[in-house]
Curated annotation (Swiss-Prot):
Residues 1-62 are annotated as: Disordered. Residues 40-59 have a biased composition (Basic residues). This is Protein BEX3. It comes from Rattus norvegicus (Rat). A motif (Nuclear export signal) lies at residues 96-106. GO terms for molecular function: death receptor binding; identical protein binding; metal ion binding; molecular function inhibitor activity; nerve growth factor receptor binding; signaling receptor binding.
């Protein structure tokens, strides 16, 4: 009987380590190997507890973001509307991007034209290059 019990214990051990260590961080639910029988007995209890704890942890992690976002929105509404500000901002960004793109294109053309005009004497060589 003892051997069979030990084999089961060894088979379950990796699962317990994988599932329970992550949410709790090696503290609760990760008992020393000396308490093998207790550990096995408490496995379901610990696992359920940790599962709920993990979910609660995720919710708590998300909450500050919501709390942070809501007051800002209220402030912006008071100042003249959240949506308008965002739309203005997006339009400005789009215009800036458009200007940047135009500048880049102009620079590229200028460089190309500059190269062509610089190499005007070697125009045939320039064209022959693959």
């Amino acid at each position: 009987m003892a051997n069979i019990h030990q084999e089961n214990e060894e088979m379950e051990q990796p699962l317990q380590n994988g599932q329970e260590d992550r949410p709790v961080g090696g503290g609760e639910g990760h008992q020393p190997a000396a308490n093998n029988n207790n550990h096995n007995h408490n496995h379901n209890h610990n696992h359920n507890h940790n599962h709920n704890h993990h979910r609660r942890g995720q919710a708590r992690r998300l909450a500050p973001n919501f709390r942070w976002a809501i007051p800002n929105r209220q402030m912006n509404d008071g100042l003249g509307g959240d949506g308008d500000d965002m739309e203005m901002f997006m339009e400005e960004m789009r215009e800036i991007r458009r200007k940047l793109r135009e500048l880049q294109l102009r620079n590229c053309l200028r460089i190309l034209m500059g190269e062509l005009s610089n190499h005007h004497d070697h125009h045939d060589e320039f064209c022959l290059m693959p």
